[in-house]
Each structure stands twice: as C-alpha cells, then as structure tokens.
C-alpha cells in the first residue's frame, strides 16, 4: 500500500510539473514575440489622421529596420530624436516615441514650395492623396531638406496638426530622425474593432522617385 501511494504521489507531481511547463511555454512565446518581433502602441493624437485616429491601437514590426530596409511611405515609430515631444506632447505613444510616415531616405532632397504645391523628392512631385488628410495642404510653408546618411525625413498624414521633420530644422538633428532611433514599422490597427485594418505604406506613391544623390 505504501509503495502504491508513493507511485500515486509521483504521478501527481509529474502532472503538476507537466501542467506548469505547458502553461509556461505560451507565456514565453508571447514574451519573445513582444521583445523581438512586434510592438503595440496606443495612438493619442491626430497627427496621422485619417490613416490613424486618436485611440487607435497599432501593431508594429520590429524586424524593420533591423532585418529589412526602410522604404518611403512606411509608417514608422521612433524615439524622440531631439525633444520633439515638447512641441507635440499629444503625440506621445508611451515612453518617448512618436509615429509618422517616412517621406525621405538618406540622400533624398525633400522640398515643397508652400501651400497649394506638392511635396517633391529629388525633383519629382508625388501625389499624396492616397493618405494625406483631405483638405490639408502637403505643407503650409516652403522648405527644402537634404537627408543625411543614417537618417530619414518624416511627416504626419495630417500635415496641419503634425510637428514633424519640417518644424525641427533648427534643432541638432536638423529635423531628421536617426535610423537607429526607428523601433518599428506599422503593420495594422487592431482596436477598436470598427477600425481593424492594415496600415498601408502606399509605396506606389514613390514609384517614380529616383535615388537620392548621396544614397
């Protein structure tokens, strides 16, 4: 009887260990995904309307730019490069992060002649109607910026409410975001339910843009 009881206790112990292992595996997998593959953010501001609305929750891929190259049109999450959040605190995603659309790659010259005129990249005008907020000018003022090596130029889709690269040309980074500060590229909106959908990079908008002189 004693031997049988010991066997039974051993079986109970093995069953408990087995349960703990199988419960722990999914938790570990989720943690690894969160750490290495995906980021999750709540969007508090309207700087990316109507692509992303305040209150939307988005998923980002951490594989770009670590594994895959950034492309013009990507919706990127990045660390605040030089106190941008002091001017655009409502865009804070938690921590010191912002979300914008990538417009210029290293070597690109991004420019606009002001209200009513399109953004040009390396002298080629782009049609941003696929993502820019309706009724908003591509830029309310003129500018011309050449993107330096290791940096990108970003703008919000709601140009009238986005303190983006255009507004920070006087800071230490000249309004450019170091690629090393980009932590992910937007994949999809997952909440609220009526807003579920992919985050389109609209790479086709930039199809005719030539490579920059210093790329």
Model-derived segments and spans:
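Soluble "head" domains of membrane/secretory-pathway proteins
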Residues: 1-16, 20-21, 32, 36-42, ...
